[in-house]
């Protein structure tokens, strides 16, 4: 009998136009470039004879499985996603796609984030998922609003300095 696990949380099916284009480009690259290369290498490894002790053959089979798994995921995910390419009617409040500048009330440090879909998060660029605790706390806030965010590192208080939708 297998161990019961709660169902995985569904991620928000929103994405920016840039994120959608990136996922489509990745799917296209996997399907048209990487997969054919791996299939050719797999055929060459299979032609070398005994497959039971053929490390190249085993590696290529595994690699092909990983590519096929990612292709299936991307195909399903792209169908489910909704591209958000317009700014909200209330451009002074924080919604999906917003570029937000925050001030940490405790340290005075200025932080800049963009709220994006879960498929396009990038900590290095300051892109946070709309499903993250900080983004959920930020939604519908306006400039000069002070709010508390319950983050993994503890409770933090922030002030919204600016909201911009120029990137949409």
UniProtKB/Swiss-Prot annotation:
Signal peptide positions on this chain: none
UniProt similarity note: Belongs to the GreA/GreB family. GreB subfamily.
GO biological process terms on file: DNA-templated transcription elongation; regulation of DNA-templated transcription elongation
Role, per record: Necessary for efficient RNA polymerase transcription elongation past template-encoded arresting sites. The arresting sites in DNA have the property of trapping a certain fraction of elongating RNA polymerases that pass through, resulting in locked ternary complexes. Cleavage of the nascent transcript by cleavage factors such as GreA or GreB allows the resumption of elongation from the new 3'terminus. GreB releases sequences of up to 9 nucleotides in length.
Native source organism of the sequence: Xanthomonas axonopodis pv. citri (strain 306)
A Pfam family of this chain: GreA_GreB_N
Keyword annotations: DNA-binding, Transcription, Transcription regulation
InterPro entries linked: GreA/GreB_C_sf, TF_GreA/GreB_CS, Tscrpt_elong_fac_GreA/B, Tscrpt_elong_fac_GreA/B_C, Tscrpt_elong_fac_GreA/B_fam, Tscrpt_elong_fac_GreA/B_N, Tscrpt_elong_fac_GreA/B_N_sf, Tscrpt_elong_fac_GreB
Entry's Gene Ontology molecular function annotations: DNA binding; RNA polymerase binding
HAMAP family in the record: GreA_GreB, GreB
Protein name: Transcription elongation factor GreB
PROSITE patterns linked to this entry: GREAB_1, GREAB_2
Lineage, uppermost ranks: Bacteria, Pseudomonadati, Pseudomonadota, Gammaproteobacteria, Lysobacterales
């Amino acid at each position: 009998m297998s161990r019961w696990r709660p169902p995985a949380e569904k991620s928000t099916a929103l994405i920016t136009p840039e994120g959608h284009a990136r996922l489509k480009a990745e799917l296209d690259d996997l399907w048209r470039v990487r997969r054919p290369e791996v299939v050719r290498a797999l055929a060459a490894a299979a032609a070398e004879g005994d497959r039971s002790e053929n490390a190249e053959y085993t590696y290529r089979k595994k690699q092909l499985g990983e590519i096929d798994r990612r292709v299936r995921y991307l195909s399903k995910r792209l169908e489910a996603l909704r591209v958000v390419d317009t700014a909200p009617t209330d451009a002074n409040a924080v919604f999906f796609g917003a570029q937000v500048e925050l001030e940490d009330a405790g340290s005075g440090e200025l932080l800049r984030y963009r709220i994006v879909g879960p498929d396009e998060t990038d900590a290095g660029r300051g892109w946070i998922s709309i499903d993250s605790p900080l983004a959920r706390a930020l939604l519908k806030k306006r400039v000069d609003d002070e709010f508390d965010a319950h983050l993994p590192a503890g409770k933090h208080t922030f002030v919204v300095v600016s909201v911009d939708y120029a990137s949409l």
